[in-house]
C-alpha cells in the first residue's frame, strides 16, 4: 500500500508541474464567414469573408463586378463535433468545384483545397480572395473599419528579407479603386492582381501579417501558390491564392495557413519556412 501511495503521489506531482495542453482554436460557418474562435485571440475571434471572390486574370485595371468576379456558391459539407475540422464545397458559375478542408490547431488554422474542372471547357478562375478582418485583433472597433488606415503601423510584410511595417516605401496611391495596397510576387503578371494601388516593390516572401493591439501576438497568413499580398479597405489583410485557370478535367491542390502566435518574429519565420519551403528557396 505504501508503494502504491508513493506512485500516486508522484503521478499527481507530475500533473501539477506539467503545463496544461493549450486549447485548440475552433471553427464555425456563419453565412459566408469562416469564424475562428479561441480565448487566446485578442477580441475572441477572427472573421474571414471566405471566400470573398473568385477572380479572372486581367484584373489590375478592370471593372471588379463586370469583368473580374466569377460568381460562386458555397456549401457547408461538415463540421466535426469538436469544431476543429470544417469542410466546404464551392461551385463556380463556370462549373469548377473547390473542396476545402479547414483544420484548427492550438495556434494555427490549416487550409487544404482541391480545385477541379469537370467541364469540357477551360475555366477562367485565376485567383481567389480570403478576406481576414482584423479590427478586433489590432485593437479597433469593427464599426469604424470603413476605409480605415489607422491599423497600418501594426501591419507588416517582408521586403529585402526584413520585416517592414506599413505603409511601406514607395506607397502607391493611384488605381482604378482606392485606397489599399497590393504587392505582386515576381512570378505573377502585374496585370492580374487586385485593382487597388500596386506597390512597385516585390515582397521577399509570401507572408503578411500584423501585431495585436497590445503587441503580444501576431496574426500572419500565407498560401501556396499565391497571387498577391493585399492590404484592404476594412482593416483586412490578404494573401490571395492562385488557381491559374483550370483546363478541362484538370485538378489542382492549394494550401494555406493562418498563424496566431506570440510576437516572436524569428520563430514565426522558422515555422513559415518549414511549412512553405517553396517560398524560401
Cite the ranges covered by each PLM segment.
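Bacterial N-terminal signal peptides
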Residues: 6-16
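Extended, loop-rich substrate-binding clefts of extracytoplasmic carbohydrate-active enzymes
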Residues: 58-106, 124-126
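Residue-level recognition of well-ordered beta-strand positions that form the cores
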Residues: 89, 101, 112-116, 131, ...
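Positively charged n-region of N-terminal signal peptides that target proteins for export
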Residues: 1-5
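Acidic (Asp/Glu-rich), glycine- and aromatic
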Residues: 104-160
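Beta-strand-rich recognition/accessory modules
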Residues: 21, 78-80, 89-91, 179-281
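Acidic-aromatic substrate-binding/catalytic surfaces of carbohydrate-active enzymes
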Residues: 21-76, 84-85
Amino acid at each position: 500500500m505504501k508503494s502504491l501511495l508513493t506512485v500516486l503521489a508522484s503521478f499527481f506531482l507530475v500533473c501539477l508541474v506539467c503545463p496544461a495542453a493549450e486549447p485548440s482554436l475552433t471553427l464555425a460557418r456563419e453565412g459566408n464567414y469562416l469564424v475562428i474562435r479561441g480565448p487566446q485571440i485578442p477580441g475572441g475571434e477572427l472573421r474571414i469573408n471566405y471566400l470573398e471572390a473568385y477572380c479572372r486574370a486581367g484584373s489590375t485595371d478592370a471593372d471588379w463586378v463586370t469583368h473580374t468576379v466569377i460568381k460562386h456558391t458555397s456549401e457547408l459539407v461538415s463540421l466535426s463535433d469538436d469544431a476543429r475540422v470544417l469542410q466546404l464545397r464551392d461551385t463556380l458559375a463556370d462549373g469548377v468545384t473547390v473542396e476545402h478542408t479547414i483544420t484548427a490547431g492550438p495556434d494555427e488554422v490549416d487550409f487544404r483545397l482541391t480545385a477541379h474542372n469537370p467541364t469540357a471547357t477551360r475555366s477562367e478562375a485565376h485567383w481567389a480572395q480570403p478576406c481576414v478582418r482584423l479590427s478586433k485583433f489590432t485593437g479597433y472597433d469593427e464599426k469604424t473599419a470603413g476605409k480605415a488606415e489607422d491599423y497600418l503601423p501594426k501591419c507588416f510584410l517582408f521586403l529585402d528579407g526584413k520585416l517592414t511595417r506599413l505603409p511601406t516605401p514607395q506607397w502607391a496611391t493611384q488605381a482604378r479603386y482606392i485606397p489599399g495596397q497590393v504587392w505582386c510576387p515576381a512570378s505573377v503578371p502585374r496585370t492580374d492582381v487586385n485593382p487597388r494601388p500596386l506597390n512597385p516593390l516585390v515582397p521577399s516572401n509570401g507572408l503578411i501579417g500584423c501585431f495585436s493591439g497590445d503587441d503580444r501576438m501576431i496574426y500572419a497568413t500565407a498560401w501556396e501558390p499565391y497571387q498577391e499580398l493585399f492590404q484592404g479597405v476594412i482593416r483586412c489583410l490578404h494573401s490571395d491564392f492562385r488557381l491559374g485557370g483550370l483546363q478541362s478535367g484538370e485538378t489542382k491542390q492549394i494550401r494555406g495557413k493562418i498563424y496566431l502566435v506570440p510576437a516572436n518574429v524569428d520563430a514565426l519565420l522558422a515555422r513559415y519556412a518549414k511549412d512553405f519551403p517553396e517560398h524560401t528557396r
